[in-house]
UniProtKB/Swiss-Prot annotation:
Function, as annotated: The phosphomannomutase activity produces a precursor for alginate polymerization. The alginate layer causes a mucoid phenotype and provides a protective barrier against host immune defenses and antibiotics. Also involved in core-LPS biosynthesis due to its phosphoglucomutase activity. Essential for biofilm production.
Record GO biological process: alginic acid biosynthetic process; GDP-mannose biosynthetic process; lipopolysaccharide biosynthetic process
Catalytic-site annotation from UniProt: 108
Name of the protein this chain belongs to: Phosphomannomutase/phosphoglucomutase
Amino acid sequence: MAHLVPAALPDSIFRAYDIRGVVGKTLHAETAYWIGRAIGAQSLAQGEPQVSVGRDGRLSGPMLVEQLIKGLVDAGCNVSDVGLVPTPALYYAANVLAGKSGVMLTGSHNPSDYNGFKIVIAGDTLANEQIQALLTRLKTNDLTLAQGRVEKVEILDRYFKQIVGDVKLAKKLKVVVDCGNGAAGVVAPQLIEALGCEVIPLFCEVDGNFPNHHPDPGKPENLEDLIAKVKETGADIGLAFDGDGDRVGVVTNTGSIVYPDRLLMLFAQDVLSRNPGAEIIFDVKCTRRLTPLIEQHGGRALMWKTGHSLIKKKMKQTGSLLAGEMSGHIFIKERWYGFDDGIYSAARLLEILSKTEQSAENLFAAFPNDISTPEINIDVTDEGKFSIIDALQRDADWGEANLTTIDGVRVDYANGWGLVRASNTTPVLVLRFEADSDAELQRIKDVFRTQLLRVEPELQLPF
């Protein structure tokens, strides 16, 4: 592996929040080696020779992680190999071990033939131009060559003990835990049991084939098994983790899905009860009901761009104690480290639930609600998605409304809102609508339809 083979490094795998590709097509053992070399050089340039490395349960993990570590060591880094862990445990390692850099080898919720790299350098989760800078290092051969070393480090036990020491339940709860055969299975069911819950496990054996359902709790069809098991067992709540455990999906005791922006309402209320005036960050896809709720409980609401690395950067800038996005990433800085952690978020949810006499269904039903659409995706090209958004920001006529253009165009009316933004990970436009009545929802959709077709008449719109 002395010579760099550019064919093993397609530009397409260097994405907005991570590096991700299809194993055997755009991602090979050699790719992992050179990515390790680039990350190592960048970490050293930022004064951080120590790098933690973890992997999820994908079948390609052992092969790729071996080469990733070899690349880091050849760059001159000292690697702490934390083994098969969920992503939050790797983020935890990059907070509590000597070094503040880390690489998680994970395909997250993508199909089983994908894998990828989530990267933290000197405490900062890489995004956008920082990820492109790694590709530039490789193309210009701006690399280091030295001999580092690798040691195996047990992090899960420490992660487990710290959460069990922090989160205290007031009563025993019956909880169904669906790990979707992802990496959360190595710690989540055991942890929730250690908190004092009765755990009914579903698909908690790590299996990179994902034989039961896709490990993406953001899609309702992947929660069907969980909902059925919650109803069948009379559980207090159901929890589902994505493939690498940095997101959590929630269903109530009656089987209703709790969408992440409503979960954030509960966390906001809880955190603000102890930290009046705290800032809470949420992404542009979240309900309009969140801002008034945060303000009513004495907090400051800040809407920001979608993307876990972008939210973490904003939290650091502002000193925010809590953030969340519609995809299910929840970031808790109060009593924790501020990274997205589906497992710790689940523990904090159980703590809140254990202290109330209300059922999960009644607890969430008390929050204001609107009629909303699921996420609507429209296929376009990668270039087209940005030019359409530019044209909408520049030329569209939305009527009497409040516009937010930090990430696409969000148009807030008196009784509802609509959003169109370019996905950072796929060649699609992402839309979402919410309103207080079906008629208003339809009216807002019609406005968006008219404006979209004005700037791009060829678009195939499903609404």
